[in-house]
């Protein structure tokens, strides 16, 4: 038996050597190995405006159906059309997202920009319709609140804001649209929001927006975006007070940045407590996104010759360098930016993509250096948009902590509204970028060119005039 086994085994070993042809081995001599297709974890490479438009349309179609603009009886669900007779049973019809949250303020600004970039009127109509609806129903809910002492909590956020979260982002978006459409009846809402921001929001002794949580006299990096863009926009809305509001916006920005920016990291800390002898650096990604977005919003409004514009720009560019150095190989950024074992987060990534693309489009930063970063980031963000149009991988609302575990274990959820506006805004700005720059694959890498390259060769040089159209 052992003899037979050995004989058969010997035959099996010998047969392949006789029967099989010699295979060609891919090696350095016969193959340009540097052109082998890499095993990317996500999408990498070419991107078209049409492709981006399809992605943001999917998100738009989802939020459009999930944010109805109707008043209903909370007990019966019946739609109320006569607002003059409604009582405390009236509330906004509930969808997946709130119409007057700060997250939706970002969404409104994003859709205003998307309408400009794409010419798609649906985006503009979405914002117009909801702003007109809120302006129409707000006085009736105010009447109910005056008579009954209570009304829908979502309207109270508009009528009686108690934090910058309640006021700033929606106020800024309303001003943007009001400046484009003089018939938009939101002046009363704008004034109510802005009165809170400029006159009632808690501040440090030097006037910096602050909170008394989680500690007394705490600066939240988030509040840069929750307050400063609205003040900057007010300089365009109330032109008689333009200089006052520009000065206030710049003052707020620099007083936040001087305390919270960490030069050696090129990042912002999330929180700063006035009474603390040390100021820990937990560089939460989304808050850093709000800070970068605030700089963009402020620079958009500041005149080129404004005395402190260079200082704002210096902070912005230093922040861009710090953030882009920490992008993951998948294209997303980490929840705590400088801690690679924290999870990859979508909303912050989308904000960075918008800011980078916007800054390139404005000529503030270099397309060669940062265009590929933005494009990789967009590919990663687009990969987080599911078939229904929901945005996956977004951290839920987050407070402040001075330990890493808090940030590492924040849940993610498709109903975290923070992801939708940034994704729409990033997509709109990427479309603008792709329409003005000319990214092309060269030696397997994304490169950005100011002029369209004629060649389709996998590797090419650009030092000859005949490569350009």
Please place each PLM-identified region on the residue numbering.
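CBM-like carbohydrate-recognition segments
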Residues: 21-103, 117, 122-124, 129, ...
